[in-house]
Amino acid sequence: MSHVDDGFRSLTLKRFPQTDDVNPLLAWEAADEYLLQQLDETEIRGPVLILNDTFGALSCALAEHSPYSIGDSYLSELGTRENLRHNGIAESSVTFLDSTADYPQAPGVVLIKVPKTLALLEQQLRALRKVVTAQTRIIAGAKARDIHTSTLELFEKVLGPTTTTLAWKKARLINCTFSHPQLADAPQTLNWKLEDTGWTIHNHANVFSRTGLDIGARFFMQHLPENLDGEIVDLGCGNGVIGLSLLAKNPQANVVFVDESPMAVDSSRLNVETNLPEAFERCEFMINNALSGVEPFRFNAVFCNPPFHQKHALTDNIAWEMFHHARRCLKINGELYIVANRHLDYFHKLKKIFGNCATIATNNKFVILKAVKQGRRR
């Protein structure tokens, strides 16, 4: 939990999920403060759009202006809602939209936290291009090290004249004025053929490894089990290639695709529709924080390629939460399979949670682990 006085409100903010007290990560950064310093409340005219507000620092500060919080992270939405409540601000003050929604017309102010993925930034700038005017104040912010020449060129190409500020507390801002430059249309998804399958994989802008199959998933797919039945889960599904493979290998199983990214879940849905349409009725698609709210003892197996970062921050909190949720939602003798970088040492984490862990396969970079839910039903 951390405190920030940004000139608009004095706020107490926390990350979501919360980090441990030993190595706490802040729920805001200098770029948030720097962005807010540029605004005079008396000059805000028209809708306020906030893009990629990780834990709600900007949304909480500008809540009295009824901002729209736009992004591709359900965790960020949950974190923002939690921080609104914690600071005594009505959740209804902020309208949440995912990045593929239609943005409000003629915004007065647009504040952008530059995302980690350049493809997501381009998708968002193209969406803004349809609604901003020459009078819209457009300001983006990030750590100085995360603003590159390619970032500035993208703003110039999609929106118009772009300048940068001096660095402040290692943060830098981008100021942009809309001039409606000529711009060719771009496809909504990036598509590629998955070797040895005949499948075409569709990827929205913010999907992990959208340009091709990542090597961890490739290794995982070589060791997926067959002859499963009942409900199984592709947890943190991304574009859904693991779940798609499970559908093909296990015709008696139903697959639940789960991710906190709306773009990921929509990519998974599209990939089942186009590649295994006959299996679509065996699928469920869920935007969720891991398996929050899912009933216990529901699933026969969970498959997971857990992230070890949240936006720009390295953390195993999300993976830890996924493992705990998986154990709660597995049936007795249900199995959790994960693929992970060897250096992360998830073997001992799983053994601590499940009381057991076995190595299924390993290479010089990755390991595939299996843990089984044991014990009596509680």
From Swiss-Prot:
Q: EC?
A: 2.1.1.174
The reactions it catalyses are: guanosine(1835) in 23S rRNA + S-adenosyl-L-methionine = N(2)-methylguanosine(1835) in 23S rRNA + S-adenosyl-L-homocysteine + H(+)
> Is Chaperone given among the entry's keywords?
no
Instruction: Say if the entry is tagged with keyword S-adenosyl-L-methionine.
Output: yes
Q: Which residues form a coiled coil?
A: none
Report the locations given in the UniProt record: Cytoplasm
Q: What is its main location?
A: cytoplasm
- Identify the keywords attached in UniProt to this record, alphabetized: Cytoplasm, Methyltransferase, rRNA processing, S-adenosyl-L-methionine, Transferase
Query: Family, per the entry?
Result: Belongs to the methyltransferase superfamily. RlmG family.
**Its biological purpose:** Specifically methylates the guanine in position 1835 (m2G1835) of 23S rRNA.
Name this protein carries in UniProt: Ribosomal RNA large subunit methyltransferase G
- Highest lineage ranks of the organism? Bacteria, Pseudomonadati, Pseudomonadota, Gammaproteobacteria, Enterobacterales
This protein's encoding gene: rlmG
